[in-house]
Amino acid sequence: SQLENLVDVKVSFPVGRVQYLALRPCSFYEFLGAIAKNDLLAILSQKPEYTVAFHEQLMHQFNQYAIIGGMPEAIQQYAETKDVVAIEDVYETLVQAYKDDAEKYVVGNKLTDTARFILSYGWAFAGETITLGNFANSGYKSREVGDAFRLLEKAMLLELVYPVSSTQMPVIPETRRMPKLIWFDTGLVNYQAGIRSEIIGSTDMVDAWRGHIAEQITAQELLALEDRVGQHRAFWAKPNNGAEVDFVVSHDSRLYPIEVKSGTNSHLRSLQVFMDSSNVDVAIRIWSKPYSVDEIKTVNGKTFKLVNLPFYLIGRIHDVLNAMV
């Protein structure tokens, strides 16, 4: 059990004899491999421009992945049955196991109650910036909620993604500011928050569930790019300004902004604020439309390239940046 590592017990390990490996939900590309869509995997390995002709097929499969998530058992059952509804029992069993583990291993009744509350109701806040005190009208104090979140974060069930205010490396999270809640698997979020039908019926994932599920799945795909256990995601927010960019990613010792947004380029005010103070000239927008590249000029006159990357190409983001810079 992941939650077994939450017990207040000191365990000694032989120095230099323990190797830590990151075990994460399956990525979209792993999902395609599991359902034998090797033809689409071959297309995704080509230059991004080549994916345009297959855009509808690729987005259909990505929407399926966003609904199902990356839990191996859920994907295996879907691969065998092609029935999205049939995998609900997998989600129910997993979530109940996490709740039982919290009660079994967490020391202290208050911490147990708070952790169980988060595991019951916290899914509805996926992709949102949250306040710890009185989280979800729970009545719990900030410290109690913070302790429970850190406990669940240590178990790799979720991550509190904190903002950075600099547009340069290194990435230093500002932990005194409000974090964004990202759960470890989108399929579980959809099931627990009761929004699967909305995602299934949506024509644009960015617009579904107020855009939060699009941020959640983007964060999940970004984390799948890294194999370091301690890797954390971050977003950018300028203090006292209101400008906020959904995520930032480091590439070749530089920080690149990522917006998850549909619509016209005129709606990218925060991205332009970031670029005006950045030392890069490439920004990324994740959306549901085909791959394209625009040239944008900020209000202050800086020109940069905006790479419009469909969701199914998030896994190629470093390759795309290599080609652009």
Over which residues does each language-model region extend?
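Conserved nucleotide-binding/hydrolysis micro-motifs of P-loop NTPases
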Residues: Q2-N5, P25-Y29, S165, L188-V189, ...
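Switch/connector loops and helix/strand junctions flanking conserved nucleotide-binding motifs
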Residues: E4-V9, Y29-G33, H267-L268, S292-K297
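Interdomain motor-coupling "hinge/lid" segment immediately C-terminal to the ATP-binding subdomain
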Residues: V7-A124
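Hydrophobic/aromatic beta-strand patches that form the interior of the parallel beta-sheet core
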Residues: Q19-L21, I182, I258, V282-I286
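Accessory nucleic acid-recognition modules appended to NTPase machines
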Residues: Q76-V249
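Conserved catalytic cores of phosphodiester-cleaving nucleases, focusing on short active-site segments
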Residues: T218, L222, V245-T264, A283
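Catalytic cores of nucleic-acid endonucleases
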Residues: S262-K305
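Domain-level recognition of nuclease-like catalytic cores that cleave nucleotide substrates
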Residues: Y291-V325
